[in-house]
Amino acid sequence: METLSFEFPAGQPPKGRALVGCVGSGDLEVLLEPGTPGTLTIQVQTSVNGAEQRWQHLFERIFQEQTPPALNIDIHDFGATPGVVRLRLEQGFEEIGHD
């Protein structure tokens, strides 16, 4: 089990919070909460050791297309594929009202 931390530039914090996914499904869960203006922080707890670079590249691809809101994101991962991670993040952004 590894804990990874990432930080990216962001816009303003949203008003809402969201919880998407389910750890019990062998997938992952993502908790999104308002953060500090201008900063997106992500903490990943993953069952896959040695995957920090893969996570870094995934987040860079997602956030190069859009400026994310200022959030604190906690991800609890149990071997989800990059596509599932992206899907869960997009679901979370939709729930908090960010395009």
Curated annotation (Swiss-Prot):
Keywords: Cytoplasm, Phosphoprotein. The modification O-(phosphoribosyl dephospho-coenzyme A)serine is found at residue 25. It holds the Pfam family ACP. It is found in: Cytoplasm. It comes from the Bacteria. InterPro entries: Mal_deCO2ase/Cit_lyase_ACP, Malonate_deCO2ase_dsu. One of its GO terms (molecular function) is acyl carrier activity. Covalently binds the prosthetic group of malonate decarboxylase. GO terms for cellular component: cytoplasm. Subunit of malonate decarboxylase, it is an acyl carrier protein to which acetyl and malonyl thioester residues are bound via a 2'-(5''-phosphoribosyl)-3'-dephospho-CoA prosthetic group and turn over during the catalytic mechanism. Belongs to the MdcC family. This is Malonate decarboxylase acyl carrier protein.
